[in-house]
Structure formats: C-alpha cells, structure tokens
C-alpha cells in the first residue's frame, strides 16, 4: 500500500522486521514456482532480487523433491533479510512502529475502523484507518473482531511440521558431503 502512495503504518511486535522468518530459525523462503513456472512475482520477487544483490540469499534454487509445494526454495541470511525489508519499506514511505502489539480493536458488526497498540514500555496509541490488514501471523486482529477460527487444520487440528535452519562455521564440507553420499538412508531427498 505504501508503494502505491497510501499512508501506511506497519505495527511490529519485535525490534526488527521479518516475523518468524527472522525471529526464529524458520526454513527457507517458500517456493515462487509451480513446477517450472514462476507464479509469484512483484514485491516478493523484488525482495528476493535485493536479497541476492546484498549477498543475503541464494535466490531460487531448484529442489530435489518439492513434496508438491513448488520446485524452488531460497535460503537467506536473517540479518540481511531484516536490513533489506527495512530499506524497501522506507523507499515505499511506510512508517514502522516497533515493540508494539495490538491491545484492542474498534469493531462494530465485523466493520473494523481502528485499533489500539501497547508498546513494550506500556504506552498505548490509538489509530483509525480505512483499511486494516491483519498480518499478525495468528489472525489476532480478526479474532478480536469476532471472526471464527480453528487451530490447525479444521478436521484433525494438526499443525504444519516445524522447520529449522541454522548456520555453522569451520565445517569440513568434504567430510560432510562424503558422509551424505555414503549414508543416503539417513536423509530425505
């Protein structure tokens, strides 16, 4: 919305951007491809291009087995992800309110007109808006406005499997690759 000229405020609970992608050890950026066709472009691709330019991502790498979810993944450096995200939002004119969470919402018959944030220090700020996008990750704003929700999938209430990514230094990569080749039954490819 900021890129299109609308006054835009991003409310972020952490002191940095990226959500689970930078606050945890979440796996790679999800696929931009369906089979061999790239189906996600626009701002996400601009972000990926900037990450590659900053030496913060591998870019799109073809997967050995997409498990039905897409044929590419993009690994990334969490700190460069934070930097590129902030730089792009600044360019788009987006204001960012860090260390703040949603305290309450102004909602009448599912019409959302505003919300109040609370900062880490306890300060409360109220915002009115024509459009509010719930990007909390858990639908916090929608739930506070009375929307129905379910935990996990609606039938078995199962969650997505967790993913983890980590970095290591001083690894004997030749030895690791040799082990993988000699012990393929220990890995899913």
Predicted regions: what is each one?
Residues 4, 8-19, 129-151, 155-157:
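Hydrophobic or amphipathic alpha-helical targeting/insertion segments
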Residues 6-7, 12-104, 160:
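Conserved N-terminal/central alpha/beta ligand/cofactor-binding core
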Residues 110, 136, 159-163:
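Short, solvent-exposed loop/turn segments at the edges of secondary structure
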């Amino acid at each position: 919305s900021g890129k299109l000229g609308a006054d835009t405020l991003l409310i972020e609970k952490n002191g940095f951007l990226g959500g689970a992608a930078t606050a945890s050890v979440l796996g790679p950026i999800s696929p931009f491809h369906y089979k061999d066709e790239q189906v996600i472009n626009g701002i996400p691709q601009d972000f990926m291009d900037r990450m590659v330019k900053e030496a913060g991502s591998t870019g799109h790498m073809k997967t050995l087995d997409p498990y039905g979810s897409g044929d590419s993944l993009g690994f990334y450096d969490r700190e460069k992800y934070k930097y590129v995200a902030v730089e792009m939002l600044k360019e788009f004119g987006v204001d960012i309110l860090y260390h703040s969470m949603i305290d309450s919402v102004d909602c009448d018959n599912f019409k959302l007109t505003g919300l109040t944030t609370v900062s880490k220090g306890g300060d409360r700020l109220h915002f009115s808006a024509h459009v509010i996008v719930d990007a909390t990750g858990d639908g916090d704003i929608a739930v506070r406005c009375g929307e129905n929700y379910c935990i996990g999938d609606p039938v078995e209430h199962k969650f997505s499997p967790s993913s983890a990514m980590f970095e290591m230094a001083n690894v004997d990569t030749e030895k690791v690759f040799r082990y993988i080749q000699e012990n393929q039954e220990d890995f899913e490819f």
